[in-house]
Curated annotation (Swiss-Prot):
Substrate binds at residues 168, 242, 301. SUPFAM superfamilies: Metallo-dependent hydrolases (SSF51556). This is Dipeptidase sirJ. It comes from Leptosphaeria maculans. One of its GO terms (biological process) is proteolysis. It comes from the Eukaryota.
Length: 394
């Protein structure tokens, strides 16, 4: 395995990225704007200024020849999740903050229309790329963000969200996390199985990064649509709990899904301080040789970590990774799939499943809501409308 891509490979990488959009599966720029700039997007110029905080700004994205990215509208798990308590009312602040983050991303897209364009479909990604814009897709990072409500999931979809990670660092009402102290559902809960069906119906991509092995297995046995791991790596290269084991990767192949390799040093090697671009390449090659390059992508997690692996310092450095893949003799047709072709295919397949379910008249997942009227008032209403009461009895 070569140590540094030369100019020839960088030129070939640039040429490839002029033909095919590089789509990053997970980017936390919105989180750092919330943390450092308190969501005030007019205090700095994110398209022109130098030396801005973090791994991401528009100049870096352009230098990195980025064709599209999933912006994460991430909000942390509430404290109750840490003790496996999932009360509905405790998620109200989580839902509010998620809406704030979705709004932030949409405002950034509106503020920088020469560079960013909202994409909600696979064809929309290609359209944005052809128009010279960075296709901007939205994801949420954990179903704690929907507050135990499929109605909220649907509203997020209507706002443009196209993938939902099932868990973050803690369990929730739907599924177990890879990093929780103990499981509570042994994979998916009953509600979790219902929400998987709803996500298939809706056309929401299921993201299994952060989930436990049993959760991933349960989902892969149930889902009718391909899934993704938006920012994970291979357990067979480095045995970290956030990485994906071979048995799950083989199921992923059967599912026609996608694992998008992360740049997080702790996921990349046993020595995070020395984790490098070459370790990311090792993970990509490992998965490609195990299950095929049709199932590998890139999910950096930029701005979701203090420091990325050496050699991939920020979004401007993506061409170095692409050049290294070419230098390691991965056929350019496969590299095109890795950088974005696979994600576009998966998204199109998810859309097709949703379309078929619509044709089959699969109904949306309804939920129990807090009672508005008591039985006595319902009886008064029923007495006022005897015809309706008679129809209800049929």
């Amino acid at each position: 395995m070569k140590s540094e891509p030369g100019n020839e490979f960088l030129e070939r990488a640039a040429n490839l990225l002029s033909r095919v959009p590089l789509i990053d599966g997970h980017n936390d720029w919105a989180n750092i704007i919330r943390g450092y700039y308190s969501n005030k997007i007019h205090v700095r110029n994110f398209s022109r200024e130098e030396s801005l905080v973090g791994h991401v700004d528009i100049k870096k994205l352009r230098k990195g020849l980025v064709g599209g990215t999933f912006w994460s509208a991430y909000v942390d798990c509430p404290a109750q999740d840490k003790i496996n308590v999932f009360n509905d009312d405790s998620y109200l602040e989580t839902i509010r903050e998620t809406l704030q983050q979705i709004d932030l991303i949409l405002r950034l897209i509106k503020k920088y229309p020469d560079d960013l364009e909202l994409a909600t479909t696979s064809s929309g990604i290609l359209s944005s790329f052809q128009n010279g814009k960075i296709a901007s897709l939205l994801g949420i990072e954990g179903l704690h963000q929907i507050g135990n409500s499929p109605s909220v999931l649907r509203m997020f979809y209507n706002l443009g969200v196209r993938y939902a990670t099932l868990t973050h660092n803690h369990n929730n009402a739907y599924a177990d996390s890879a990093t929780a102290k103990t499981p509570v559902h042994n994979g998916l809960s009953i509600k979790g199985r219902a929400i998987i069906q709803e996500m298939n119906r809706l056309g929401m991509i299921i993201d299994l990064s952060h989930t436990s092995e049993q959760t991933a297995e349960d989902v892969l046995r149930q889902t009718r649509a391909p899934i993704i791991f938006s920012h994970s790596s291979a357990f067979g290269v480095h045995p970290h709990p956030r990485n994906v084991k071979d048995n799950i990767l083989h199921m992923l192949k059967s599912n026609k899904g996608l694992i998008m390799i992360s740049f997080v040093p702790e996921f990349s090697s046993a020595d995070p301080g020395l984790s490098s671009l070459m370790d990311v390449v090792k993970h990509i090659i490992y998965v490609g040789e195990l299950i095929g390059y049709d199932h590998v992508g890139i999910g950096s997690d930029f701005d979701g970590m203090a420091r990325a692996v050496l050699g991939l310092s920020d979004t401007s450095t993506f061409p170095r990774l692409v050049a290294e893949l070419i230098a390691n003799q991965i056929p350019e047709g496969d590299v095109e799939k890795i950088v974005g072709g696979n994600l576009i295919r998966v998204m199109g397949d998810v859309e097709a499943v949703a379309h078929r379910q619509c044709e089959d008249d699969i109904l949306e997942l309804e939920e129990e809501v807090k009672p508005l009227w008591d039985d006595a008032f319902k009886a008064k209403i029923a007495a006022a409308y005897p015809e309706a009461l008679a129809l209800n009895a049929l």
